[in-house]
Amino acid sequence: MSHTPTPAAGSGHAPANGHMALVIGAIGVVFGDIGTSPLYTLKEAFSPHYGLTSDHDTVLGVLSLAFWALMITVTLKYVTIIMRADNEGEGGIMALMALTQRTLKQGSRSAYVVGILGIFGASLFFGDGVITPAISVMGAVEGLEIAAPSLHPFIVPITVVVLLVVFMVQRFGTEKVGKVFGPITCLWFLSLGAIGIWNIVDAPEVLKAFNPWWAIRFFMEHGWHGVFILGAVVLAVTGGEALYADMGHFGARPIRHGWYFFVLPMLLLNYLGQGALVLNHPAALKNPFFEAVPSWALYPMIILATLAAVIASQAVITGAYSVARQAMQLGYIPRMLIKHTSRDTIGQIYVPGINWLLMVMVIALVLIFRSSTNLAVAYGISVSMTMLIDTLLLALVARSLWPRWRNWVLPLCVVFFIIELAFVIANGAKLLQGAWFPLALGIVVFTLMRTWRRGRALLREEIRKDGIRIDSFLPGLMLAPPARVPGMAVFLTADPMVVPHALMHNLKHNKVLHERNIFLNVDTLPIPYAPADKRLQIESIGDEFYRVYVRFGFMETPDVPLALMRSCDQGGIHFDPMDTTFFASRETIVASANRGMPIWRDKLFALMHRNAAPATGFFRIPGNRLVELGAQVEI
């Protein structure tokens, strides 16, 4: 069903030992978010906010809803179907958007709508990324209340300290500690299953929740109020989208096997165990997860839950770095400083700007909401909307790329859409109670991304409009050629057909040309990694002038000097970094009320442009080989 063979790690038939290592690694990274959902899902479903009683039919109804949500949304949609919609092995909403746009006519209304959906979905991811660390860590630390109620005043301070440590150590990378994430998370899931079995033996009738009749009966008894309970049920599937987003790191097979044969059974056992406890001891509703733990294992379980929450937070934070890098490469957010934290693993990066923004917002959330129950009210809306967008994009992929399978995938997409629309409606009812926060954050990020994208387009238009075409400029220049100096000049340009401002300034003030001159355009392809045969394209335009295109995938960190060094000799240009000067224009944006965007967006774009990391640093151009020349552009 996949449109192309996927080169993602683990997608082939790896040796058994290697495959098992990938499965354990995936358990440590991919399933962290969904693995901490038992900490708060049933606790939220039976909170006073929803007014449910703990009678037999209601408990079985809620358990049945959670079971079928996991089976339909996570197992069927994400693990079985959508993970086949890979973009050269990569997953996630940005990769899915780029894949979908490749099936549509460039510049068409459909491509525009898909772009809007993808950007909004990525924006909502950051809302989810703020809440997940807060609710996971706080839900784990709240276990202390069960062990020692007198510790209640210390729950928030302890949560803040744990989160501060998590964010402060990001700059050191996770290469070393990441090796223990898998075993710790495996122990966490085994503990979930063991706790579940411990309680199920006391009330085995909870196994009847596998029958969908109990979910249907729940809606029949509770009517529209039953729909709103889905606002709590959706917490059981939060993190399901991470299985697809992290596919490029581990491959589809290890993630599928980890889910089918280990993670899903352990989660189901734990939810059923909590339900069994509630049937026998309704007072356990205050915190059914920790009440289900035997007293002798309570403190070890609190420690293990906190470690699992930290690992889940780590997965979301690194996921935010990855999405931010993809968005930068695809031109949706300003360039930011990216640091590599591993010499061996290219995907391990640290983005300081994203890290500190997340830290401030996560800690602010903890201080404002002060409990996992209050945070659960805010949770879910962004996840539900992201899942809904994934379904719409999946339908487009199935229609265009899967002719053999579309007749059964498209009807399933209708089922997914109805379920996820119900999740969105249920969470929308909590807007005033706190669900507004991730939605508002998503809208802010969406506005920033759209403003940056549109502003860059307007900037290119202005430069092109005021510029001189190279094909008409060079013949005139060669009629009275300026003096030539030894070496090579590389002029970075967004439009290689127009004379760069930096060249015009150099001629005006220095009145010289280098022996060899390159007009360099750096482009990002809508695929994760640029193939070697598309990495570099060289065109000779006469008199030792060359037009060079360097291309990268959206998962790559651009290194222009390295790309030139590896490829230029093949195109007949000798590239010596020590004999090359890079020239770049640094535009100053002047906002105008009479141009393409409202004045407030012009000013916002100017602010973002002013604070963006210079293209030269982003492209790894050495500062001692760089000349930057300013230019003022009105948009």
Swiss-Prot record:
Catalytic activities: K(+)(in) + H(+)(in) = K(+)(out) + H(+)(out)
GO cellular component, one term: membrane
Organism: Xanthomonas campestris pv. campestris (strain ATCC 33913 / DSM 3586 / NCPPB 528 / LMG 568 / P 25)
Keywords linked to the UniProt accession: Cell inner membrane, Cell membrane, Ion transport, Membrane, Potassium, Potassium transport, Symport, Transmembrane, Transmembrane helix, Transport
Family in the record: Belongs to the HAK/KUP transporter (TC 2.A.72) family.
Protein name (database record): Probable potassium transport system protein Kup
GO MF annotation terms: potassium ion transmembrane transporter activity; symporter activity
Source organism, top-level taxon: Bacteria
Any matching Pfam family: K_trans
Biological role: Transport of potassium into the cell. Likely operates as a K(+):H(+) symporter.
GO BP, sorted A to Z: potassium ion transport
InterPro entries xrefs: K+_transporter, K_trans_C, K_trans_N, Kup
Major location category of this protein: membrane
Localization per record: Cell inner membrane
Topology class, membrane: Multi-pass membrane protein
HAMAP family in alphabetical order: Kup
TM helices/strands, residue ranges: 20-40, 62-82, 111-131, 149-169, 180-200, 223-243, 259-279, 292-312, 349-369, 377-397, 408-428, 429-449
